[in-house]
Structure formats: structure tokens, C-alpha cells
Amino acid sequence: NKIEPLFEGVDFVFHLAAESRIQPAIENPTQSVEINVGGTCNVLQASRLKGVKRVMYSSTSAAYGLKNKPPLREDMIKDCLNPYSISKTAGEELCKMYTDLFGLETITFRYFNVYGERQPLKGQYAPVIGLFMKQKENGELMTVVGDGLQTRDFTHVKDVVRANIAATKCTSGFGEIFNIGTGKQISVIDLVGLLGGEYVHIPERLGECRFTEADITKARTILKWEPKVTLVDWLKE
């Protein structure tokens, strides 16, 4: 009830709010589920009651886990390794249900390792690019988790924004999931090489994917969206 007035007269809702880190979710699963599942249900219900046209929901590539091999497609099985990915994929199901049952148009995005301006730069669980940049700036060793051979599909925040805007203009794909990535993977150790500097290995962490790379065919086809920012070009800037 508290959030319903905020949805009055709104056409599009971009739902990005979440408890959004894997390791803190492992430490406090109840909080992660309550915030991410309950919060998403609140957003969808308020949108339905106030006549919102469409909800864009931000989910995670962590849904693919370890059982699926890149490139990762939206029709692959879910393999949730931690409470965070469980809570976010539950939100995906809620979005589909609100589309099927109530006719609320929803679009779900699975983001692949978003980076860019205003990214968190400190803390044990800050995204790796921001963390490495801050460590290097401070003259510290960059902390590589495990052997560093794990790969990620790093996606610039501007491309994420463009995907959300594109979703306000599409005419199909409601209740469905769309990967938002670049379709290219880079290892953490190669990222260190791009940044330059000394590093140290730290122990592996539980509940994290090994390799990620998005198949973005569906977003290209239905949303008419393409990634424009490459990691190499952004680092040069």
C-alpha cells in the first residue's frame, strides 16, 4: 500500500531495486528473498492496480549457474547456485505470471556483469572492474578470486539503459526473458592484463558461475537492440 501512490499515472516501470550481491545473499538468505521476491511482487501488484502499461524487470545471468555452457540462451535450464539467483528467478516467474494471469505487460532482462560510471569501487563484494580500478589507484594488489580463469561477459551500463528504453517500444515478447550482454567473454586474469598492475590470488568463493557469455540473438531480434560499448574502448577512455 505504501508504494501504490507512486505508480499513479505511470506508463512504464523500470524495476532495478534489489539486494544485488551474491555473497551477502549467501550470508543472509532470508533478507535476500524477502527483499527481492517480496519487493518484486509489490511492484507488480502496484503496477497492476494503478494501470501501468509495462514493467521492465532486472534479473541476472546468475540464473544459468554451472550446468549450462556458453553461449547462454534464455531457453536453457535454470541452475541457481545461491539465494540471490533463486530470488531473482522467482521474480522472473512472478513477471510471467502477472502477464499471463492479469495481462500486465512485463519484460525481464538477465544482465551480464554490468560495469561503468558510478559503479561501486570498494567493499569486499564490489563488482570486479570497479574493485580492480580502485585497488590499482590505491597502489594495492588486485585481488583475483581463484585461478582467474573464470570468464565474464562485461556489459556497459549505457547498453543496459538502452535495452530498457528499447523494451518500452517493442510490440512482442511480453512475459519473456532477454539476455543483455555483449556476446563476448573475457577471463578475470585477462582483465588484470588490460588494466595493468600487480595482483594476488585469493580463495575461490562459493555459489559463483565459472563461465558466462550471453547469446543476445533474442534481444537483437525482438527488441532491435545491440550493444555499442566495448570493455577495451571504455578502459582506454
Please place each PLM-identified region on the residue numbering.
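Short-chain dehydrogenase/reductase
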Residues: 31-33, 76, 81-92, 123-130, ...
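Conserved Rossmann-fold cofactor-binding substructure of NAD(P)-dependent oxidoreductases
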Residues: 1-12
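Conserved Rossmann-fold NAD(P)-dependent oxidoreductase catalytic core, especially the SDR/UDP-sugar
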Residues: 15, 34, 41-83
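C-terminal "lid/loop" region of Rossmann-like NAD(P)-dependent oxidoreductases
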Residues: 147, 177-178, 186-193, 197-216
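Catalytic Tyr-X3-Lys loop
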Residues: 14, 18-19, 26-37, 41, ...
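Active-site Tyr-X1-5-Lys
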Residues: 49, 66-68, 81-107, 112, ...
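Amphipathic terminal alpha-helices
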Residues: 230-237
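Glycine/proline-rich active-site loop of Rossmann-fold NAD(P)-dependent oxidoreductases
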Residues: 89, 114-130, 138-140, 145, ...
